[in-house]
């Protein structure tokens, strides 16, 4: 869930460039989403894109990251620190970062699983633990996100987005029509196949190729463009349940995140 606000030529643009929406399948998550709706943190974007299937697609009213900021209000969050070592001492954990040490009774790791594996390897003897075998097998899809600011309106139909429309693009959205940007800017998520093909190429050339492709596909005229690469955009396989409790370490270690529960925001929440 990633959003950003930028100013270009004295104009404000806000865009989502990670998860674009979420759905609800369980009562537990549905109850929570209803509460967010009452607080005007989220709203129904649409019931489908090219086809209306009747299932609500929810969006955050001010960008997806804004929802995270609201629900984490009051928590003490340490940012811009890399965990380099994890230790367990009888009844508590100690995490060492490039700046400080942190201690806690429980440890919950929600990073993409390849990063989770590297963290777990810093725990003495954990690399030989059977629990690592399953998560080591999970592979991820890559995604290159192209963000474009526009000097004029796009020609996108309501609700302003297209999903899985061809072999090059997984999702393309006009953030103004979506309702989060005061000026027109488009987010385009390249397909895994195209992202893999272009991943190691020169970034300027990649951007030019993607801009040309999207211009030909939608007949739009971007003024400025940016890229963001998602190395772990989506897991190719999901794990059952909503978390893993590791039997060792006195049941004080848990693995969670969107790889559980269907690779969706709902799975990460539950």
Stretch-by-stretch model annotation:
Residues 208-209, 213-251:
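Flavin (FAD/FMN) cofactor-binding core of flavoprotein oxidoreductases
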Residues 79-94:
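A conserved short coil-to-beta-strand element within the FAD-binding core of flavoproteins
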Residues 1-10, 24, 41, 83-86, ...:
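Catalytic phosphate/metal-binding cores of nucleic-acid and nucleotide-processing enzymes, i.e., regions
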Residues 2-46:
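N-terminal FAD cofactor-binding segment of flavoenzymes
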Residues 242-270:
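Short FAD-binding loop at a beta-strand-to-alpha-helix junction that anchors the flavin cofactor
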Residues 21-27, 46-70, 200-209:
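Short beta-strand to alpha-helix junction loop
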Residues 145-198, 209, 213, 217-218:
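Active-site substrate-recognition segment that forms the wall
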Residues 7, 11-12, 104-159, 220:
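Central helical "cap/lid" subdomain
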């Amino acid at each position: 869930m990633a959003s950003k606000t930028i100013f270009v030529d004295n104009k404000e643009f806000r865009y989502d460039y990670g998860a674009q929406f979420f759905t609800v399948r369980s009562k537990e998550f549905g109850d929570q989403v209803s509460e967010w709706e009452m607080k005007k943190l989220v709203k129904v974007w649409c019931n489908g894109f090219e086809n209306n299937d009747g299932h609500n697609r929810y969006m955050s009213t001010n960008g997806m990251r804004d929802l995270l900021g609201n629900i984490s209000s009051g928590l003490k969050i340490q940012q811009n620190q890399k965990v380099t070592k994890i230790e367990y001492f009888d009844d508590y954990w100690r995490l060492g970062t490039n700046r400080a040490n942190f201690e806690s009774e429980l440890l919950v790791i929600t990073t993409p699983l390849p990063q989770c594996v590297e963290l777990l390897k810093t725990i003495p003897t954990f690399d030989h633990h059977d629990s690592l075998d399953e998560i080591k097998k999970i592979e991820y899809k890559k995604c290159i996100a192209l963000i474009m600011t526009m000097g004029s309106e796009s020609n996108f139909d309501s609700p302003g987005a297209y999903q899985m429309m061809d072999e090059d693009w997984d999702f393309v959205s006009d953030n103004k029509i979506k309702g989060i940007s005061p000026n027109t800017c488009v987010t385009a998520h390249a397909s895994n196949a195209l992202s893999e093909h272009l991943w190691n190429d020169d970034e300027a050339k990649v951007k030019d190729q993607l801009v040309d492709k999207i211009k030909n596909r939608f007949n739009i005229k971007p003024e400025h463009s940016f890229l963001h690469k998602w190395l772990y955009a989506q897991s190719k396989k999901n794990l059952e349940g909503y978390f893993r409790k590791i039997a060792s370490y006195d049941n004080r270690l848990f693995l969670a995140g969107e790889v559980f529960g269907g690779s969706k925001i709902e799975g990460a929440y539950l």
